Protein backbone atom coordinates (compact mmCIF):
# COMPACT_ATOMS: atom_id res chain seq x y z
CA UNK A 1 0.00 0.00 0.00
CA UNK A 2 1.56 3.27 -1.08
CA UNK A 3 1.18 6.61 0.68
CA UNK A 4 0.70 9.79 -1.34
CA UNK A 5 2.37 13.00 -0.21
CA UNK A 6 1.54 16.56 -1.20
CA UNK A 7 4.52 18.92 -1.08
CA UNK A 8 4.59 22.73 -1.24
CA UNK A 9 7.90 23.84 -2.70
CA UNK A 10 9.67 27.18 -3.05
CA UNK A 11 12.63 27.81 -5.32
CA UNK A 12 14.82 30.49 -6.81
CA UNK A 13 14.50 29.84 -10.54
CA UNK A 14 17.68 31.69 -11.53
CA UNK A 15 19.84 28.62 -12.04
CA UNK A 16 17.13 26.25 -13.23
CA UNK A 17 16.25 25.53 -16.85
CA UNK A 18 12.61 25.43 -15.75
CA UNK A 19 10.54 22.93 -13.77
CA UNK A 20 10.18 20.09 -16.25
CA UNK A 21 12.94 17.51 -16.62
CA UNK A 22 15.12 18.06 -19.71
CA UNK A 23 18.14 16.11 -20.95
CA UNK A 24 21.48 17.50 -19.71
CA UNK A 25 19.76 20.42 -17.95
CA UNK A 26 19.37 21.32 -14.28
CA UNK A 27 15.64 21.48 -13.58
CA UNK A 28 13.45 21.61 -10.48
CA UNK A 29 11.87 18.26 -11.33
CA UNK A 30 15.30 16.68 -11.68
CA UNK A 31 16.70 17.88 -8.33
CA UNK A 32 13.51 17.10 -6.38
CA UNK A 33 13.17 13.65 -7.96
CA UNK A 34 16.78 12.91 -7.03
CA UNK A 35 16.19 14.01 -3.42
CA UNK A 36 12.95 12.01 -3.07
CA UNK A 37 14.57 8.83 -4.36
CA UNK A 38 17.62 9.32 -2.18
CA UNK A 39 15.39 9.78 0.87
CA UNK A 40 13.54 6.59 -0.07
CA UNK A 41 16.86 4.68 -0.29
CA UNK A 42 16.76 4.49 -4.12
CA UNK A 43 13.94 1.96 -4.58
CA UNK A 44 13.99 -0.55 -7.46
CA UNK A 45 11.06 1.26 -9.06
CA UNK A 46 12.05 4.96 -9.10
CA UNK A 47 9.63 7.42 -7.51
CA UNK A 48 8.08 9.90 -9.93
CA UNK A 49 6.94 13.40 -8.94
CA UNK A 50 4.01 15.29 -10.46
CA UNK A 51 3.92 19.10 -10.35
CA UNK A 52 0.96 21.47 -10.37
CA UNK A 53 2.44 23.39 -13.27
CA UNK A 54 5.58 24.00 -15.26
CA UNK A 55 7.63 27.13 -14.72
CA UNK A 56 10.08 28.36 -17.36
CA UNK A 57 13.79 28.99 -16.95
CA UNK A 58 14.36 31.86 -14.52
CA UNK A 59 10.82 31.83 -13.08
CA UNK A 60 10.56 31.53 -9.30
CA UNK A 61 8.04 29.90 -6.97
CA UNK A 62 6.81 30.44 -3.43
CA UNK A 63 4.13 27.78 -3.64
CA UNK A 64 4.74 25.22 -6.38
CA UNK A 65 2.88 22.06 -5.40
CA UNK A 66 3.68 18.47 -6.30
CA UNK A 67 2.85 14.94 -5.24
CA UNK A 68 4.56 11.57 -5.14
CA UNK A 69 3.96 8.11 -3.69
CA UNK A 70 6.13 6.28 -1.18
CA UNK A 71 5.85 2.51 -0.66
CA UNK A 72 5.46 3.09 3.08
CA UNK A 73 4.26 5.85 5.41
CA UNK A 74 6.60 8.39 6.96
CA UNK A 75 5.58 11.26 9.22
CA UNK A 76 5.09 14.34 6.95
CA UNK A 77 7.43 16.42 9.09
CA UNK A 78 10.08 13.74 8.65
CA UNK A 79 9.60 13.93 4.89
CA UNK A 80 9.93 17.72 4.95
CA UNK A 81 13.10 17.66 7.03
CA UNK A 82 14.56 14.75 5.08
CA UNK A 83 14.05 16.41 1.71
CA UNK A 84 15.37 19.77 2.90
CA UNK A 85 18.56 18.08 4.11
CA UNK A 86 19.15 16.80 0.55
CA UNK A 87 17.89 19.62 -1.66
CA UNK A 88 20.20 22.37 -2.96
CA UNK A 89 20.15 25.78 -1.31
CA UNK A 90 17.96 27.35 -4.01
CA UNK A 91 15.09 24.94 -3.25
CA UNK A 92 13.13 24.34 -0.03
CA UNK A 93 10.13 22.27 0.99
CA UNK A 94 7.73 24.50 2.92
CA UNK A 95 5.03 21.96 3.83
CA UNK A 96 4.22 18.26 3.47
CA UNK A 97 0.93 16.47 4.04
CA UNK A 98 -0.51 13.01 3.43
CA UNK A 99 -3.35 13.12 0.90
CA UNK A 100 -5.80 10.57 -0.55
CA UNK A 101 -4.33 8.28 -3.19
CA UNK A 102 -6.54 9.83 -5.88
CA UNK A 103 -5.20 13.36 -5.24
CA UNK A 104 -3.35 14.84 -8.22
CA UNK A 105 -1.23 17.99 -7.93
CA UNK A 106 -1.99 19.07 -11.49
CA UNK A 107 -5.54 17.94 -12.19
CA UNK A 108 -7.15 18.78 -8.84
CA UNK A 109 -6.32 22.49 -8.85
CA UNK A 110 -9.15 25.02 -8.58
CA UNK A 111 -6.95 28.07 -9.05
CA UNK A 112 -3.45 29.52 -9.19
CA UNK A 113 -1.98 32.83 -8.10
CA UNK A 114 1.00 34.52 -9.79
CA UNK A 115 2.97 37.62 -8.80
CA UNK A 116 5.08 39.75 -11.15
CA UNK A 117 7.67 42.43 -10.29
CA UNK A 118 8.46 44.96 -13.02
CA UNK A 119 11.53 47.12 -12.36
CA UNK A 120 11.65 50.47 -14.17
CA UNK A 121 15.01 52.09 -14.77
CA UNK A 122 17.28 53.01 -17.64
CA UNK A 123 19.83 50.46 -16.46
CA UNK A 124 19.54 47.04 -14.85
CA UNK A 125 20.00 46.93 -11.07
CA UNK A 126 22.58 44.18 -10.40
CA UNK A 127 20.80 43.28 -7.17
CA UNK A 128 17.40 42.96 -8.84
CA UNK A 129 18.33 41.47 -12.19
CA UNK A 130 17.45 37.89 -11.22
CA UNK A 131 14.25 38.76 -9.34
CA UNK A 132 12.49 41.44 -11.40
CA UNK A 133 11.69 42.01 -15.04
CA UNK A 134 13.61 45.05 -16.31
CA UNK A 135 11.74 47.75 -18.24
CA UNK A 136 13.79 50.68 -19.52
CA UNK A 137 10.89 53.14 -19.76
CA UNK A 138 8.63 54.09 -16.85
CA UNK A 139 4.92 53.26 -16.92
CA UNK A 140 1.98 55.20 -15.49
CA UNK A 141 0.32 53.08 -12.80
CA UNK A 142 -2.99 54.94 -13.22
CA UNK A 143 -3.23 53.86 -16.87
CA UNK A 144 -2.40 50.27 -15.94
CA UNK A 145 -5.00 50.21 -13.16
CA UNK A 146 -7.65 51.55 -15.55
CA UNK A 147 -6.89 48.77 -18.06
CA UNK A 148 -6.16 45.69 -15.97
CA UNK A 149 -9.77 44.99 -15.01
CA UNK A 150 -10.56 44.14 -18.64
CA UNK A 151 -8.55 40.93 -18.19
CA UNK A 152 -10.83 39.70 -15.42
CA UNK A 153 -13.55 37.21 -16.26
CA UNK A 154 -13.80 34.22 -18.58
CA UNK A 155 -12.15 34.81 -21.96
CA UNK A 156 -10.41 33.10 -24.84
CA UNK A 157 -6.80 34.14 -24.19
CA UNK A 158 -5.42 33.05 -27.58
CA UNK A 159 -3.83 36.49 -28.02
CA UNK A 160 -1.96 35.98 -24.75
CA UNK A 161 -0.48 32.51 -25.26
CA UNK A 162 3.00 31.84 -26.62
CA UNK A 163 3.69 29.52 -29.52
CA UNK A 164 4.61 26.07 -28.28
CA UNK A 165 1.60 25.80 -25.98
CA UNK A 166 0.18 22.29 -25.80
CA UNK A 167 -3.25 23.52 -24.69
CA UNK A 168 -6.02 23.07 -27.27
CA UNK A 169 -8.54 25.15 -25.31
CA UNK A 170 -7.42 28.72 -24.62
CA UNK A 171 -10.44 29.70 -22.51
CA UNK A 172 -9.49 30.58 -18.94
CA UNK A 173 -11.08 32.61 -16.15
CA UNK A 174 -9.19 35.31 -14.29
CA UNK A 175 -10.78 35.89 -10.91
CA UNK A 176 -8.62 38.84 -9.89
CA UNK A 177 -6.06 41.05 -11.66
CA UNK A 178 -4.37 43.84 -9.72
CA UNK A 179 -1.44 46.23 -10.10
CA UNK A 180 0.21 48.67 -7.71
CA UNK A 181 3.33 50.84 -7.63
CA UNK A 182 6.25 50.87 -5.22
CA UNK A 183 7.84 54.22 -6.18
CA UNK A 184 10.80 53.92 -3.77
CA UNK A 185 11.73 50.60 -5.38
CA UNK A 186 10.96 51.80 -8.92
CA UNK A 187 8.67 48.81 -9.25
CA UNK A 188 5.19 48.11 -10.51
CA UNK A 189 3.87 44.82 -9.19
CA UNK A 190 1.08 42.67 -10.55
CA UNK A 191 -0.94 39.82 -9.11
CA UNK A 192 -3.19 37.50 -11.09
CA UNK A 193 -5.44 34.79 -9.68
CA UNK A 194 -7.30 32.51 -12.07
CA UNK A 195 -8.58 29.07 -12.89
CA UNK A 196 -5.31 28.36 -14.68
CA UNK A 197 -2.88 30.07 -17.02
CA UNK A 198 -1.61 29.30 -20.50
CA UNK A 199 2.02 29.10 -21.58
CA UNK A 200 3.61 32.53 -20.93
CA UNK A 201 0.15 34.07 -20.43
CA UNK A 202 1.05 36.10 -17.34
CA UNK A 203 4.24 37.43 -18.90
CA UNK A 204 2.43 38.44 -22.10
CA UNK A 205 -0.34 40.19 -20.12
CA UNK A 206 2.29 42.09 -18.13
CA UNK A 207 4.07 43.15 -21.33
CA UNK A 208 0.81 44.53 -22.75
CA UNK A 209 -0.06 46.31 -19.50
CA UNK A 210 3.39 47.91 -19.31
CA UNK A 211 2.98 49.16 -22.90
CA UNK A 212 -0.37 50.65 -21.87
CA UNK A 213 1.35 52.32 -18.92
CA UNK A 214 4.06 53.69 -21.20
CA UNK A 215 1.45 55.19 -23.55
CA UNK A 216 2.32 52.82 -26.40
CA UNK A 217 -1.18 51.32 -26.34
CA UNK A 218 -4.61 52.75 -25.57
CA UNK A 219 -6.03 52.20 -22.10
CA UNK A 220 -9.07 50.47 -23.59
CA UNK A 221 -7.18 48.16 -25.99
CA UNK A 222 -7.56 44.86 -24.09
CA UNK A 223 -11.11 43.92 -25.22
CA UNK A 224 -10.02 44.25 -28.86
CA UNK A 225 -6.88 42.20 -28.20
CA UNK A 226 -8.97 39.43 -26.62
CA UNK A 227 -11.41 39.49 -29.53
CA UNK A 228 -8.59 39.28 -32.10
CA UNK A 229 -7.36 35.87 -30.82
CA UNK A 230 -4.06 36.67 -32.51
CA UNK A 231 -0.74 36.30 -30.67
CA UNK A 232 0.94 38.79 -33.02
CA UNK A 233 -1.34 41.53 -31.68
CA UNK A 234 0.17 41.24 -28.18
CA UNK A 235 3.78 41.33 -29.41
CA UNK A 236 6.09 41.16 -26.39
CA UNK A 237 6.69 38.88 -23.42
CA UNK A 238 7.87 40.25 -20.07
CA UNK A 239 11.18 38.83 -18.75
CA UNK A 240 11.01 35.55 -16.85
CA UNK A 241 12.95 36.81 -13.82
CA UNK A 242 10.04 38.93 -12.55
CA UNK A 243 7.53 36.07 -12.37
CA UNK A 244 6.68 34.07 -9.24
CA UNK A 245 4.25 31.17 -8.84
CA UNK A 246 2.76 32.33 -5.56
CA UNK A 247 0.11 29.75 -4.64
CA UNK A 248 -1.83 26.77 -5.97
CA UNK A 249 -5.37 26.21 -4.70
CA UNK A 250 -7.14 22.88 -4.19
CA UNK A 251 -10.07 24.01 -2.05
CA UNK A 252 -12.73 26.49 -3.18
CA UNK A 253 -13.19 27.89 0.32
CA UNK A 254 -9.48 28.77 0.57
CA UNK A 255 -9.56 30.33 -2.90
CA UNK A 256 -12.63 32.42 -2.09
CA UNK A 257 -11.15 33.54 1.24
CA UNK A 258 -8.00 34.76 -0.51
CA UNK A 259 -10.01 36.56 -3.18
CA UNK A 260 -11.74 38.49 -0.41
CA UNK A 261 -8.45 39.10 1.41
CA UNK A 262 -6.53 40.29 -1.64
Swiss-Prot record:
Stated role: Formation of pseudouridine at positions 38, 39 and 40 in the anticodon stem and loop of transfer RNAs.
Pfam family, one: PseudoU_synth_1
NCBIfam families documented for this protein: hisT_truA (TIGR00071)
Similarity section: Belongs to the tRNA pseudouridine synthase TruA family.
Organism of provenance: Lactiplantibacillus plantarum (strain ATCC BAA-793 / NCIMB 8826 / WCFS1) (Lactobacillus plantarum)
EC number(s) per entry: 5.4.99.12
GO molecular function, one term: tRNA pseudouridine(38-40) synthase activity
Protein keywords: Isomerase, tRNA processing
Protein name, per record: tRNA pseudouridine synthase A
A single GO BP: tRNA pseudouridine synthesis
Subunit structure: Homodimer.
Binding site for substrate: 114
Gene: truA
Catalytic residues as annotated in Swiss-Prot or TrEMBL: 56
